[in-house]
Amino acid sequence: MKHITKLLMLLAIGLVVTACKDKIDEVETELAFTTLSVSSVNTTSATATAKATGSHITYRGVCYSTSPNPTVNDTKILSDRSNMRLILSGLATHTTYYVRAFVQSNSNLVYSNEVSFTTLSGPSIEDDPQTEGPSALKRVSVHDPSVVFDHTTSTYYVFGSHRAAAKSNNLMTWNAFTAPWATESSSNASNTDAFTTPQVTKVTKGGQEYDLVFDALAWSKKGSTDYDISGNMWAPDVIWNPTMNKWCMYLSINGDHHFSSIILMTADKIEGPYRYQAPVVISGFYTGTDYKSTDLEIVLGEQASLPERYKTSNWGKRYPNAIDPCVFYDEQGKLWMSYGSWSGGIYMLELNQQTGLRNYDVNYAQQGSGDDIKVDPYFGKKIAGGFYASGEASYIEYIGGYYYLFVTNGGLSAFEGYQMRVFRSANPDGPYVDSKNDAALLPQYYMNYGPTENDGNRGENILGAYGQWGYTAVDRASERAQGHNSIIAAPDGRTYLVYHTRFQGMGEGHEVRVHQVYQNEEGWLVAAPFEYTGEGVKSAAIGSVQKVATSDIPGKYKLLTHRYKLNHVAQELSTPVEVTLNADGTISGAQTGTWSVKEGSSYVNITLDKTYKGVMIWQTLEPKDEKAPCFTGLDSSTGVTVWAYKYANN
């Protein structure tokens, strides 16, 4: 009995020691932070960045107040990641805020250092002086231009297909350059070497590491026997990732028969060199064991064979070609990528801010079947198109309360109907609708461009093929096949639409064009009728300042309607007619109607067959230094836009 008692006592001591050891393990990593920083401060928001570490964390985030030493009892934002990048939104203008990060366990609460910042005053409605004009225009050819602004040098960049790129400090004078590629052994690697060996070879899902060594070049070679990488580096999108402290280029490595991938390349400087990190998404695994070369099993789990839904001869009707990325942060600080071309629809994935790659911890439950896919476990959520209807070059930008989605329909050649369409949503991942409330996501196949378009003319027709307009877009230089655009709500208080255009009589030659964009009274985007040449009108001024005096409006105008269903094969263009805006508010001439100004604003309505709600501003009629009142407007019931400009010397 004594021996049993002694044995029980020893066991009890052992249990106590074990329990104590377990307790020590629980608290051995203290709660801690890297230094909290605040950046991107503007009128109503700011971005807080910090890293929270420690064991058994229950909550982490930032708290803020207009008084010093904020606590978790004040306004707070929670984070599910240790590397926190949180956007403080809804702030008052010209107000000082105090911010602290916090991390909490079951037994402890720790705060970071305190940072204070003052939001900017409300957006300026004062025009910037126009210090330059049409003489500053220096053209550049960049196909599929994606625009990005480098705050450190106050320089705009456009990156495009086939390694074309250019930079400008005024969006008018462009200088071309080529960003070099890097590998482990070279800072100026060849195209054939740059995409074979990723720097990142492991990714994490659910806390577990998985090997991922993807040769992007070898994958795209599967589509053809005579593959040439030099013509297949398509449509990059470049963004600054503050968590990674890197410039991130998302580049399409295109291959025939959908053997394509979007890869991440990073650089310390925006002009490179860029080094291949890892794939973000891959397409084309529809036969055999090809999927074993991709990250499909990391996303879905181990598969005995390729899932039946991917074994299809209708890949282009159901799934995307993994090209044409658009990467952006939403207003809550999440990182997203929309992508896809040309016929399977536009899809969207959430990315990991720490790696810039796919967020493998976000799952996508299958929705839909057959060709009617709405959500795919691998490709993500479909937000537009599908069923072999055309659509590519998605671009999403948050402007004035909405996420705007641009998609380009049609074929990219000069006479194949390339044309931008616009949708919007309150959420980054949709649903996206046009001004008629028609969805960007299609329920079946439609012809969605050209004279036989039968989709109800989905998507605002922000501009299309046009000619005999002003002094530049005339005759053989008339614009057509405009598309694969990007758009930027720029730090100068203006929004710019950037696209490439072909021309009526110049073959397949193309150039970049930039137009300022405004929101009309209904919040839809309308593009200025002429190329940007340094006009200083701020977006915030449109709703509160009348830029063109009522007395300056009457006179003779050229009026151009951007029509749907142009016959591009027949080289059809939209061309202007002559009308007169009379002082009594009537319109006479080739079309008749009325016009009116909303008092105290630049909002103008022109009623013809429909009512076009838009804005009236002064523009320069490039290439001359001739200024004129110009109108741009949208009839939201049809999606049709119109432009008008007043004749000189009226």
What is the predicted role of each segment?
Residues 2, 95-96, 524:
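Intrinsic low-complexity, intrinsically disordered segments enriched in polar/basic residues
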Residues 3-10:
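Sec-dependent signal peptide recognition
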Residues 13-14, 162:
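Processing junctions and N-termini across compartments
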Residues 16-19:
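C-terminal motif of bacterial Sec signal peptides marking the signal peptidase cleavage site
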Residues 21-122:
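Short, surface-exposed linear motifs at loops/turns and structural transition points
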Residues 120-650:
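Carbohydrate-active catalytic/glycan-binding domains of CAZyme proteins
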